[in-house]
Amino acid sequence: MSMANERPRVLSGIQPTSGSFHLGNYLGAVRQWVDMQDTHDAFYMVVDLHAITVPQDPKELRENTRVAAAQLLAAGLDPDRCTLFVQSHVPEHAQLGWLMNCITGFGEASRMTQFKDKSAKQGNDRTTVGLFTYPMLMVADILLYQADQVPVGEDQRQHLELTRDLADRFNQTYGDAFTVPTAYILKETAKIYDLQDPTAKMSKSAATPKGLINLLDEPKATAKKVKSAVTDTDTVVRFDRETKPGVSNLLTIYSTLTGAEIAELERKYEGKGYGALKTDLADVVVEFVTPFRERTRQYLDDPETLDAILAKGAEKARSVAAETLARAYDEVGFLPAKH
């Protein structure tokens, strides 16, 4: 097990494909990554190798990678308290990914639900082998850093089980090369729903962007989205996920951003109707996104500093990854290169 100051090591990553983070993925993951810097030896990466399992425009991918890194820093990741890097800057990911491919059964890989879901939507001709082997690269991402813990939500549990299975399989077949990680269950965060369809999770794949609170949008546009959020024909501000999903979603967002209890908010808006709630919430959201947007812009306007942070992170990541890969190569029986 690898430790820094006796802290468990944790690894997580985020896709660079979305441009702006939205409020749902910020609250669901990124905010907790920021907190984990104080309790863990934390490694965080922008997973551009994973991004190309589906078609990407090269210029957009490059830009989105920078924007994702800038937003992580704007959210509070501190390069002195965590290791932040871009996945493709550490070639050991792809190298260990190949070893993981070679110890994974075809049937085992076929059962991964994410592949089944995406390939069903795209059809066989448009589904890449990269998408099929995506989970094995994810396993390599984790094992390279001898991560003790992996932050997981419900949709990632299957990938963590595969990671544990492959780590055990490799260790038993060849020799102990990998830490077998455990799940770090992310705190039960309030689920944030689409403003236009409050029965669906806030997501980039939504039918319309009107329901998304993008953190890099113009604050005025964000305020307008909040004020236009779908509610119901009633006027009572009350939390009830079943019968009042729209209002409940607005109360959840308000509570999550301010720390106010939902019951307290219900009392505050008793007899005031939805208009007052939406107006105040629009102000709360704008107050949150405006400084976030400004901090992100500062990093993007100073590419030298951003590049230096990512280079430092990649150097630290490679120092750990290279050691793990060398050990795995030795256990497999590869002839060592003599320099």
Swiss-Prot record:
Reaction(s) catalysed by this chain, per the record, are:
tRNA(Trp) + L-tryptophan + ATP = L-tryptophyl-tRNA(Trp) + AMP + diphosphate + H(+)
Localization (cell): Cytoplasm
Q: Which domain of life is it from?
A: Bacteria
PROSITE patterns in UniProt:
AA_TRNA_LIGASE_I
Q: Does the keyword Disulfide bond apply?
A: no
CDD domains, per database record? TrpRS_core (cd00806)
In which broad location class does this protein mainly occur, judging by the first location in its UniProt entry?
A: cytoplasm
Answer whether the UniProt record assigns the keyword Lipid biosynthesis to this protein: no
Positions binding L-tryptophan in this chain are D141
NCBIfam families in alphabetical order: trpS
- What is the role of the protein in this entry? Catalyzes the attachment of tryptophan to tRNA(Trp).
- The entry's protein name is Tryptophan--tRNA ligase 2
- The organism named in the record is Streptomyces coelicolor (strain ATCC BAA-471 / A3(2) / M145)
